[in-house]
Amino acid sequence: MRRLKIILLAVIAVMGLNVHASELNAPVGVRPCCAFGVDLKAQLGSVPVPFFSLENVVDKGSVGDHHYNDGSASISGSLLGLADETNGLVFTKLGGFIDTAHVRDTADYTYYIFQLNQGYLGTSHHIDLPAELRLRRVTWHPQTQPLSKEQKITYSAEAAALTAFRLAQWHEIAQWFGMVSVGGFDELASAFSSEDLYSNMLGAHLAKQILIATPMLNTKQFSAAMDHALETALSELNAVTKSVTKEKIQQLDGIWWDSSKRLPNKWALIYRDYHLSLSLMPNYPTATHRLQLSETFDTNQPIEQWLSVSFIAADEEDAFDKLPSAIRTKSSWSSQDFQSLANYAEQVDKNAMSKLGIQAHKIKP
């Protein structure tokens, strides 16, 4: 009888997670932040926007309350600090520049996919996420290996973190190829920005740690846990004050970014990182804290044999017209194609910058 009760309780717990996952909406797009720079100006077409300046920097202790991104936060609220969440750039001595919007975006997707994993991990299933130039398809692959309750939680969190980060890598690629997602502006000035993917990976790590420790959190509880986790992470990375962050960015004017350019001009951003890896070092030379995500479970089985993401040709293939035919003609791309796409982007940018007389510099220690 006692064994039956334990089984029933386990079933009820799993059902509770599955019901929650079925009611949970995927994160809506991305938080509209942040091109690298400070006091950024904008223009609409050829007309500069008067009285507009985007400071783009937040204080280490004033990033606000995390909210699972269900789309309720306005663009102006996130950008201008009118929402409970305040996003922007923070300089840390160990992690370099951190974009809190990127941290939060990938944390939210890690949470979302973790919830889906409770019902689908080890089974045959797929879901389609809204297109970012290509349709984003998340696929679960059937497995025969039984998992204990603890293993399922760990596997679910690790697979969610990796998949969420893969989505972030794709977002950088889609930005470069001209995706438009915020207010009708393209995002060329943000594509492959040097702090982006490091920040995304930090978000994946924080969410993974939260979910392994406390897997039954609802969105409000997860958001509260992220508040503490982000605050702790910034402290451990030795985050500096808002004024120091601003000074650090201003010192890079003409090296990593160009204050004379107005958004959405692509060349407002000069220095980009096209290296797509699961092991990342900060681009700022004195920052030394490496972040890594594993491609395998502790059994050495590749995570993507359980859960993978693919990018399927949709209605915006003209964005990829100039790609070499060997990759352009593939109807589905996977993470294995990412570096080839990034290498192409890097070469195109090098050629364009050479013609424009723009030179990117790495900072000397």
Describe the residue ranges of each PLM region.
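Bacterial N-terminal signal peptides that target proteins for export
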Residues: 1-7
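Targeting-peptide/extracellular-domain and disordered-appendage signature
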Residues: 4, 17-18
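Divalent metal-coordination and catalytic microenvironments
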Residues: 172, 196, 202
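A glycine-rich, coil/turn loop motif that links secondary-structure elements
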Residues: 189-195
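Long, internal stretches of domain cores in catalytic or enzyme-like folds
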Residues: 184, 199-204
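Short, hydrophobic, well-ordered secondary-structure elements
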Residues: 167, 196-198, 206
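Bulky hydrophobic segments
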Residues: 19-189, 208-365
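Bacterial N-terminal signal peptides
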Residues: 8-16
